[in-house]
Amino acid sequence: MAAPGRLLLRPRPGGLLLLLPGLLLPLADAFNLDVESPAEYAGPEGSYFGFAVDFFEPSTSSRMFLLVGAPKANTTQPGIVEGGQVLKCECSSSRRCQPIEFDSTGNRDYAKDDPLEFKSHQWFGASVRSKQDKILACAPLYHWRTEMKQEREPVGTCFLQDGTKTVEYAPCRSKNIDADGQGFCQGGFSIDFTKADRVLLGGPGSFYWQGQLISDQVAEIISKYDPNVYSIKYNNQLATRTAQAIFDDSYLGYSVAVGDFNGDGIEDFVSGVPRAARTLGMVYIYDGKNMSSLHNFTGEQMAAYFGFSVAATDINGDDYADVFIGAPLFMDRGSDGKLQEVGQVSVSLQRAVGDFQTTKLNGFEVFARFGSAIAPLGDLDQDGFNDIAIAAPYGGEDKKGLVYIFNGRSTGLNSVPSQILEGQWAAQSMPPSFGYSMKGATDVDRNGYPDLVVGAFGVDRAVLYRARPVVTVNAGLEVYPSILNQDNKICPLPGTALKVSCFNVRFCLKADGKGTLPRKLHFQVELLLDKLKQKGAIRRALFLHNRSPVHSKTMTVFRGGQMQCEELVAYLRDESEFRDKLTPITIFMEYRLDQRTAADATGLQPILNQFTPANVSRQAHILLDCGEDNVCKPKLEVSVNSDQKKIYIGDDNPLTLTVKAQNQGEGAYEAELIVSIPPQADFIGVVRNNEALARLSCAFKTENQTRQVVCDLGNPMKAGTQLLAGLRFSVHQQSEMDTSVKFDLKIQSSNSFDNVSPVVSYKVDLAVLAAVEIRGVSSPDHIFLPIPNWEYKENPETEEDVGPIVQHIYELRNNGPSSFSKAILNLQWPYKYNNNTLLYILHYDIDGPMNCTADTEINPLRIKTPEKNDTAAAGQGERNHLITKRDLTLREGDVHTLGCGIAKCLQITCQVGRLDRGKSAILYVKSLLWTETFMNKENQNHSYSLKSSASFNIIEFPYKNLPIEDLFNSTLVTTNITWGIQPAPMPVPVWVIILAVLAGLLLLAVLVFVMYRMGFFKRVRPPQEEQEREQLQPHENGEGNSET
């Protein structure tokens, strides 16, 4: 597996393969790095300008430069394609970049057309480092061959420039070639300088890619250089050697750093070995004196590329170098439990020589390659602790790249970035890779703060971020007196004759900072009274001069000078204007640098130290009647009762709770009675028609999805207060599973201590009450025999062949308030007597949630029913059988009752479904009086009472958890059959009609006369002319009456 974002050559069957699988990565930002006007540098298109970056400060010049590697740039070397360059860029407004000439020659030959080296595509500039006048730049893909062999081998080469002298440095170009030696060394893949003027070079391809570290003295490299000698031996060289075969493919030298880890004052060598330990990855620390092993770190996840990047710096100020190790392919589980690539940096703090404590810092985005580059920044904000930058070159919007700035502190690295730098370029043929290379810890503009350069080789850019000077402010705020007496009104309120209770607010600023800060610093200061009150709430204190809770001021202080102070007077509003007397009044002071503050000598605007608060606050308290400590401790109690102990389900149930609230302790401020309302109830209001009950002010509100009634009990609710109040509720939304309704009551105040009473619950039981009735009617209720013109037919076919229509109607009605879910209705119908049919059922109909069945076939003779409504039919039948011929007076004893005890009855059984309050189920039974039976001689001249009966039984209620009593009843419906003459209506005498007409006319005449005397029929029109108006005047005054 090749590195994520680095070049590395490995042999494969059939030839060599160049692997560049991760030239794509992301960017970050620190709080005092200037992101408003960074210096942007552009290189030749497609040259990978920005692949490596560093600062350069030659002793022969007062100017600072940037060094930027462009490993795919074309050069003037004859016959060379993409030989690569290192450019020197001016840190001035011109931002001009010029290539540094290290090598102007083409390939050298053993003989004509027999080259010994191959400089095309050598990636010169893939690594660049400087130290004072010295610059080391390398081409890790430089190839050469020996005279005896034709294979090209990527040994790598470097050039070292010291002032005007430039020498080639190729420690892997030796006779020990091929894969088992240094033939695939790729020397210069990673490089660094030590303080003792040694060069450290990594060659991850040596010894079957075990890798190798090589260190030589700069002086010896320069002194021994001979352009005619291709393989130079150095006497003071330190180098790792080949190891056992199990260390093959480890990539020692993939990344390097230096630092003193054994306390001898000589910098030691740190190297990442990302494929060691079966791809877990390792980091080795070697002694800088003899290349012996000092310490090893091992990764915890396979293929995470632990050791891809390394850095060494003292992050916590204990004078021990700490180690930072990047693993950009590290995977962690997301919130969904799935593994995702986030990258990781291990921070190993050295607490004593060789004693490390490691913590992990995971990346913030998926596939961002967090940890691809790590750059020590020096003390970026001048707080006494070094800081560090970590790149995620493929993070951010559209993978433009991110660089995170983390600040050091005494406990180690702050895990939250103080600033995030974002790449500004969209991907073109490849991602911008902003942050793939970084270098810091150098003060380019000499303002006392180190700066940072970031490379984005995917868009051929490098960006210089300069650090802004940091201002540290010491702010003071005093409030006196801190206990405010509302009754001590001694300050005149401007513009009025009123006096108010007042207090003083004194605020001060002092500022200082390191570096080239301007002498005068301007601040925008804002003071806010009663800060903790929410927006829109009444602020209890105002400034006297502007009657506002806000005061804004521009203050000027001298850097490093004395504390600058000012004083204002504020006052309390009248106590009738606010309720909260208990909460402290917070006086809040906030400050920020004024934009008019001059820039420093380098043109950068100062910035406030973000690690010190930019505000300060103090508190004042309103004097309370709570003893010497001014702390009120109430003793709140609540009790509740009601005269209603039971509520019927379905009823509108008005419920009155009588609540007793009392305070047996010190004053309770903003005291409120809070009643939590159950979902079955609604608040109606406060009982106001009872003199014994307090008329509280109550409001309904919802808090955290709990419905509440909140009643004001006083501010304060003084010691010894007892209140009795009535609250009315309606309870009407009970569910079928409820057995009771519960109200929770408590008293709450804004006091700091004992501010809530014990919660009291009041429970009212639910009960079932269903007033169900059954009633019936016969239509008609009386039939007179004989039927005129009726003739017997042996096989009747129509209703007229049988007899008149008789309809019995039964209604089962639930008058509530509770519902029932199932009932049985039984109808007993007098069908036959002595084998003679009485009432022949044609059919029955239902209205409502009911299904019925009969135990005998209905209408077995298939009597035809005309298509007209039953009511009309019944009425018509009634007209058809009126008898007017004779009148027969019947004795009471001559009536024969034919009910189910005597007659044979047909039974209709109905299952009734749910009936809520006010709902009914109706059964219509349409029948015919079997006239033949009553026209028999033995049945004539008798009266009959035909009775049907209906009964019901409630068998189920919808209320599962409540006890239910059995509910049943019955009723009878009677149709009377009379043999005789229907009583004719008595005619009205003619004299009665005449007398009524005359009385009406007389009454009308009296009304007309009375209205005439009152002037009802007079109509005075408005005058059209002035004369008419004058003529009308006498009449209006009553001086004449023409009509009279």
Curated annotation (Swiss-Prot):
Residues 1023-1038 have a biased composition (Basic and acidic residues). GO terms for molecular function: C-X3-C chemokine binding; extracellular matrix binding; extracellular matrix protein binding; fibroblast growth factor binding; fibronectin binding; insulin-like growth factor I binding; integrin binding; metal ion binding. One of its GO terms (cellular component) is alphav-beta3 integrin-IGF-1-IGF1R complex. Residues 1-30 form the signal peptide. Residues 31-988 are extracellular. Ca(2+) 2 binds at residues 314, 316, 318, 320, 322. Residues 1013-1044 are cytoplasmic. PROSITE patterns: FG_GAP (PS51470), INTEGRIN_ALPHA (PS00242). It is a single-pass type I membrane protein. FG-GAP repeats lie at residues 32-98, 109-170, 173-225, 237-291, 292-357, 358-415, 419-482. Belongs to the integrin alpha chain family. Heterodimer of an alpha and a beta subunit. The alpha subunit is composed of a heavy and a light chain linked by a disulfide bond. Alpha-V (ITGAV) associates with either beta-1 (ITGB1), beta-3 (ITGB3), beta-5 (ITGB5), beta-6 (ITGB6) or beta-8 (ITGB8). Interacts with RAB25. Interacts with CIB1. Integrins ITGAV:ITGB3 and ITGAV:ITGB5 interact with FBLN5 (via N-terminus). ITGAV:ITGB3 and ITGAV:ITGB5 interact with CCN3. ITGAV:ITGB3 interacts with ADGRA2. ITGAV:ITGB3 interacts with FGF2; it is likely that FGF2 can simultaneously bind ITGAV:ITGB3 and FGF receptors. This is Integrin alpha-V. It comes from Mus musculus. The gene is Itgav.
